Amino acid sequence: MPFVQVTLVQGRTPAQKHTLIAELTKAVSTTLDTPADRVRVAIYEVSADDWGIGGVPYSVARAPQPDGTS
């Protein structure tokens, strides 16, 4: 039974997560020739303050800059 774990920074809508689950299930089922009802998908969401990029929190790394860039 394939088990897929996805970690995302918070902010996706329920509809986006539902689509992700459906598409991952299809891809795994097709690739591994496994019935879709045997595929498990878990989504774990992390806050932007708890995710680091280059030594700084994602919330800081991706914050808009004074010049309008991020």
Region spans (language model):
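A domain-level signal for the structural core that forms small-molecule/cofactor-binding pockets
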Residues: P2-S70
